Amino acid sequence: MATARVEYIAPWWVYWLHNLPHVDFSLQRESGDFNPKDPGYQQTLLFVALFIALCAAVNLLFVSGYLICLCCCKKEDETETKMTSSCCVTWTAAVSGLLCCAAVGIGFYGNSETNDGVYQLTYSLDNANHTLAGIDSLVSNTNAKMKEDLDQHLFRLNEIFAARGDYIQSLRFMQQMAGNIIQQLTSLPNWQGTSVNFSEIARNASIIEYYRWLSYLILFITDVVICLVTCLGLAKKSKCLLLTMLCCGLIALMLSWASLALETSSAVGTSDFCVAPDKFILNMTPDQITADVVHYYLYCSQSQRNPFQQALTVFQRSLTTMQIQIQGLLQFAVPLFPTAQKDLLGIQLLLNTSESNLHQITALLDCRGLHKDYLEALIGICYDGVEGLLYLSLFSLLAAVAFTAMVCAMPRAWKHLAARDRDYNDVDDEDPFNPQARRIAVHNPNRGQLRSFCSYSSSLGSQASLQPPAQTVSNAQAAEYMNQAALFGGNPRYENVPLIGRGSPPPTYSPTMRATYLSMNEESPNIYSNVFPA
């Protein structure tokens, strides 16, 4: 198998984050080596978060200054800029909503990538923990069999073979081989502390990741709801919704900056680990595990010597020697001492079980299994995990920009709605042509209507409050009006529909139209004499 350095290569974004300046609170450069217990290194990560917090403060100051200036500025002539302001608010809200939706989409992808990376890490840690716990279980089981069960069988056989010195010598030799096996098993590393650490890390990582994933999911949904409700408030021109969403937008803006600080500092710290993970693991290895063993699992090279080879070889040879001795006693001693057969078969079964345990221990101690888990954990946290954190950082940045634009646009929408209400209410209540009078006329059809000034009947004056003038209109004039209506409209009729009932003001005539109408009146007798002959 190739070395870990060939199989695992940190991605470019890890090196990019690792090469960012590591500065402590005194503005002094610190080492970028991952060491979370070092106070200086902790300050470098906190400095990244504080720098983003400073950017958030500048952003909030800008938004606050903009809102104050917008509220304190003098009222200008809004008639010329009403359409421009409305269009600007609409486009700002639309772009902010689209930007927020794009940010949420990026955030969903980043959240999923980070979750996959942490899941791969915990899965690999659980596999490694299972392997190490299996080694400890097999070693302790084999030691117990060699110390207790074998001693009981040998004690009874010593009593049975007391008269035969050669058989007693064989039993003592097997006792010596069992001691060698116990000694070699004791020399193997005790993985109990390491497996407990792996189990604790995996459990804590799973719990933290669950709440992190759930928190971001709630944040995504909240951002989308704020954008949708803001658009709804603009569409319905609701001041209450706009005011509520203004407060929610400010809260979402602060949450976006806070998440950006957390994600960036976490990405920088994880990248520092991913650049040189072997160095950190060597420094954190418990004292009972030697550096040779750690190197064996970290690099897993075929050219590297197996640190367990000698112990396993002695174990195998001792078992083989004991099995040969038991075979000889079964062949030669059982015919003379039939009562010894049960204990000899018990020792043979114990040796067969120990040999099976030896094969399992050899397979579990091989570097390929644990090294595979190690590489999968690195790929999960350094590829998917850091990549997901970068996408989440991009989400937070875009969301901050979107909510900044949205918060700045909502007061202008408020002013536009207020100006619209003032224009709507600034009308004469006695004006029969204002919108309110038109609505009343539509909803109250039984109300007395004013007669049209242009209709034939109203020109005679039909209202009771007005004194009608003397009747000067003849039948010929009525026929003349009907014929004019026939010429211009196609059908002779009286115009009996009041203009006010239609919701339109009385007509006005330009001088040109009046001259044209008078000239047509002068020529009308000739035309009417042809149309209606006497």
Swiss-Prot record:
InterPro entries: Tweety. Its main location: membrane. A motif (RGD) lies at residues 164-166. The lineage of its organism: Eukaryota, Metazoa, Chordata, Craniata, Vertebrata. Coiled coil: none annotated. The chain crosses the membrane at residues 45-65, 88-108, 214-234, 241-261, 389-409. May act as a calcium-independent, swelling-dependent volume-regulated anion channel (VRAC-swell) which plays a pivotal role in the process of regulatory volume decrease (RVD) in the brain through the efflux of anions like chloride and organic osmolytes like glutamate. Probable large-conductance Ca(2+)-activated chloride channel. Disulfide bonds join 274-382, 300-367. This is Protein tweety homolog 2. The gene is ttyh2. Residues 1-44, 109-213, 262-388 are extracellular. Glycans are attached at residues 129, 197, 204, 352. One of its GO terms (biological process) is L-glutamate transmembrane transport.
